[in-house]
């Protein structure tokens, strides 16, 4: 959830949709934070942060095994805690042996430390973090809202 001090608005609703499809012939699961739609394109959160975690032992269909999936759920909780009020998690995309967490933020000063902290949060996996301007929320909007 995004905090009032960060957005200048009331806290956003914590509502998520589950979408299913395929990407390059493999199943794709997307959890989409529909409560964040009001922030899209408003200008306060124009930096997209992608956090990609490749699976160590994906199933043949590219999805995680149960044990690895559980570890990634714990990682997601840690990720949300580390972001705090600096941004909001808008999507979690699972496909092709990777889980990607998509966030939007208005500031990037904290991202380098965030990347180091994430690597410590799941030392059994490689964590890749990227940040790019995305004032139109292209990734988020590609899933429909």
Labelled PLM ranges:
Residues 120-145:
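Conserved short beta-strand edge segments in small beta-sheet-based binding/regulatory domains
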Residues 104-112:
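Helix N-cap motif at beta-to-alpha junctions
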Residues 49, 99-101:
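Short amphipathic alpha-helical segments
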Residues 1-77, 84-90, 108-109, 142-144:
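Charge-rich, low-complexity segments
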Residues 78-85, 113-121:
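Generic non-transmembrane alpha-helical segments
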Residues 92-97:
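A short beta-turn/loop motif at secondary-structure boundaries
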